[in-house]
From Swiss-Prot:
Pathway: Amino-acid biosynthesis; L-lysine biosynthesis via DAP pathway; (S)-tetrahydrodipicolinate from L-aspartate: step 4/4. It comes from Nostoc sp. (strain PCC 7120 / SAG 25.82 / UTEX 2576). The gene is dapB. It holds the Pfam family DapB_N. (S)-2,3,4,5-tetrahydrodipicolinate binds at residues 168, 177-178. NAD(+) binds at residues 13-18, 111-113. CDD domains: DHDPR_N. It is found in: Cytoplasm. This is 4-hydroxy-tetrahydrodipicolinate reductase. GO terms for molecular function: 4-hydroxy-tetrahydrodipicolinate reductase; NAD binding; NADP binding; oxidoreductase activity, acting on CH or CH2 groups, NAD or NADP as acceptor. It comes from the Bacteria.
């Protein structure tokens, strides 16, 4: 039994669907302490984060839209380990959120997708200069990591592959960060996929999906009723090999989120992807 003080945690995007799950998971973890709950939505200001997340008892942590004061408050807590902020916000704000957190010495765990490669590199440089750990994780599901590993193995034997990602219609960015990461992992093999057999003509622009690295196509679907789903489809003469991961409940991401909160304290730079800390 350890007597170490719990890790102070801020949840940014606490009123969102993922944010509420994170609030519940953090509140139920004995080694974590929810100190702040940030959200920009006016209708949730002042509400108790625990009650909003569906917990039976209030946490006495009110929702606020004041990020910088909360970062300063947690940074000023000199007892125990450094603070961690979990960000599930919006592609338009996540870059500034992460820079602000690092500037205060707060370790970011980022689940928000939509950051450009240039933004990720800038954050990596900033985190390294500050010797501050930062995790950017497109998908916190252990099952998705296993799918990606299986896809990398399969891509050694198949020359044709396409990715289909399906999400709820409130997701702002496309393709998903997970689909982009999957394509990047396949592209690391250094082979070119999907060499054209015929000269293709798109009668409607975008009909063949977006073109990622090394000829890999990504198709995005946005519909109500979906949460998060991905297929990686390999083809060869006479056969199709399909890998698929389906999310039926956002609770499946919480083991990965909690692992990331604990692991980010051990880092001195930015790390991209859940597979790097498993």
């Amino acid at each position: 039994m350890t007597n170490q003080a719990p890790i102070p945690v801020i949840v940014n995007g606490a009123a969102g669907k993922m944010g509420r799950e994170v609030v519940k998971a953090v509140a139920q973890a004995p080694d974590l302490n929810l100190l702040g709950a940030i959200d920009s939505s006016p209708e949730h200001q002042g509400k108790d984060a625990g009650e909003l997340a569906g917990l039976s008892e209030p946490l006495e942590v009110p929702i606020t839209n004041q990020l910088e004061p909360m970062l300063g408050y947690v940074a000023g807590e000199r007892q125990g380990p450094p603070g961690v902020i979990v960000d599930f916000t919006h592609p338009d704000s996540v870059y500034d959120n992460v820079r602000s957190a690092i500037a205060y010495g707060i370790r970011p765990v980022v689940g928000t997708t939509g950051l450009s490669p240039a933004q990720i590199q800038n954050l990596a440089d900033f985190a390294e200069k500050a010797s501050t750990g930062c995790l950017i994780i497109p998908n916190f599901s252990i099952g998705m990591v296993l799918l990606q590993q299986a896809a990398v193995t399969a891509s050694q034997y198949f020359d044709h592959v396409e990715i289909i990602e399906l999400h709820h219609n409130q997701k702002a960015d496309a393709p998903s960060g997970t689909a982009i990461q999957t394509a990047e992992l396949l592209a690391e093999l250094g082979k070119t996929f999907n060499s054209a057999i015929v000269e293709e003509t798109e009668k409607i622009p975008g009909a063949r999906g977006s073109l990622a690295e090394e000829g890999i196509r990504i198709h995005s679907v946005r519909l109500p009723g979906l949460i998060a789903h991905q297929e990686v489809i390999f083809g060869a003469p006479g056969q199709i090999y399909t890998l698929r991961h389906d999310t039926s409940d956002r609770a499946c991401y919480m083991p990965g989120v909690l692992l990331a909160i604990r692991k980010v304290l051990q880092l001195k730079s930015l790390v991209y992807g859940l597979e790097k800390i498993l």
